[in-house]
Amino acid sequence: MSAAREEAALAILLELLGTPAAPISSASVRRARDVHIADSLSGLEIERLRAAARIADLGSGAGLPGLVVAAKLPEARIDLIESASRKCDFLGEAIARMGLRNATVVCQRSESWAEGDGREVYDAVTARAIGRLATIAELASPLLTDGGVLLAWKGARSEEEERELGRASARLAMEVVEVRPMAPYRGSRKRHIHLLRKNGPTPNELPRRPGMAAKRPFGSE
């Protein structure tokens, strides 16, 4: 996809985010270009994401960052994992309207997907504003290949969440590589991307039953 087509695809996404079908608030629509899309694009500063051949976007929702990454990385294969049917419908429409040939909607829980075709096949997993770090790491681990990476978009750093993740890391076969401060848009403060790497085979206990990673995250004991 040429640069012009990439920009055209993102313009279509902005248009779609302004429709009633979009799973995003009206306030978020007004901030979509300057905040949400800019924030999504910031992940491309991380080389491991740019180099990934197969990427999963966890809890894709409105496709931020998944649709943005798909538009900017046309050679990569992107699976948008989302369990809510209305959001899946939006993502499917967006893929068609944006002309993305490299993106697919996986309309099921990530835990279920990780028990089948999604197990240990992704070079990178992206997740933006979907939960606690330990929860995100647990959901990502069974999807990632050994050595694959998780990029978790977060706001201000939380000592509590980072300690919880530290206690859970060995159990999840995940290790923290970097916590990178980001400034994706004017006036942005306290934005971070947490970069984690899978450091072994998926533990046998993963994935747990759907919902358990959020309800009782490892490391919270």
Regions found by a protein language model. Name each.
Residues 62-75:
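Conserved SAM-binding loop of SAM-dependent methyltransferases across substrates and taxa
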Residues 14-21, 69, 139-144:
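Short amphipathic alpha-helical segments, especially helix-boundary/capping motifs
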Residues 1-56, 86-103:
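Class I SAM-dependent transferase core
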